[in-house]
Amino acid sequence: MIKDCTRREFLGTLGTAVAGICVSPARLAFASRAPTAPVAVGRCYIYGAEVVQVLSTMFDQLGGLERLVKGKTVAIKINLTGLAANRLRHLPLELTHWTHPQVIGATVHLLGQAGARRIRLLESPMSTAEPLEEFMLQANWEPRDFMSAAPVVEFENTNYLGRAKKYSRLWVPDGGLMFRAYDLNHSYEDCDVFVSLAKLKEHATAGVTLSMKNCFGITPCTIYGEEAGRDEPSLVPRGGRGMFHHGERQPSKSALSEIDLRSPRDPGYRVPRVVADLVAARPVHLAVIDGVETMMGGEGPWTSGRRHVKSGLLIAGTNCVTTDAVAMALMGFDPIADRGKPPFETCDSTLRLAEDLGVGSRDLRQIEVVGTPIAQAKFNARSA
């Protein structure tokens, strides 16, 4: 039975970027019309009770959670990329490339306090249809800590059909860049509020992985994986999403195929467009980025040049593009940068593509930053 939990009780139990581009006046005019929203930045140096306190202040600075979640079902996509056995120098996964359980639990707790009716923790664990809770246990996490953080907390592995009888088809407004629609686990449709709870990292293919790239993982490998079924989705997910990276095959025939089969097969072209499509089709209402401790040089221990970094940051906003723009600036990158410039040396900018789709603005001049100023918290991701 799931019990109610006071703030004090929760704190006690959880404990534990083609060289240079010319931007046309027309492009700038469109960008200036893209939606914008404030972004909160908070300093947090350790994963303790401070996480709840800092996040609570940040959410208040954004206007409070109650107006967003009271009486509603909230879905939270967390970032548990790779396998539980993938570690950087034997460090716990949550100190490098996974969203930290303290940040997950604190967010769940504050959403519950704000009156969320139901909270679902979602992720698509690699190559398995086992319950998400079991995947967490492999990393020595305790799912019951999350269950005690709010009155009703559920878990779902979204890498396959899950508990529903059919997949949900989410359409990209105005037609999409790579696909017109994506077939997803029901949990991404059966919610009133969608939260992307990400990690502050660079990415070998997409330049950075923040609140938008985190949504790449909402796609089920039973349809979009290398070993997905040809006609119908496979029953169990196997392998990764190489289809999105290289385009060597199409999704299961039950889903829609690519818009243009003659488009480039370059992962640096394809992946950013898929991500931009996804955040347009499944809008993010709240973006939270864990940068207290993380890794740079890539998205996981399997990339080269990776290193553990203590950046001491939490970032949150109600628009995923504006939030990622501020996060990029905090990492020492220019959010207006595109292919050929750091961190997008070999890829197109997901931020620019999402901005072009009208999701949000990446122009810092249009974004109000509340809490800690960028200048006071900025670090160099390439030398940290």
Features from the language model and the residues they span:
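Extended, low-polarity segments enriched in aliphatic/aromatic residues
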Residues: 30-384
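N-terminal secretory signal peptides and thylakoid transit peptides that target proteins
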Residues: 1-18
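C-terminal segment of classical bacterial N-terminal signal peptides
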Residues: 23-27
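A general, composition-driven signal for non-globular sequence regions
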Residues: 1-2, 21, 71, 207
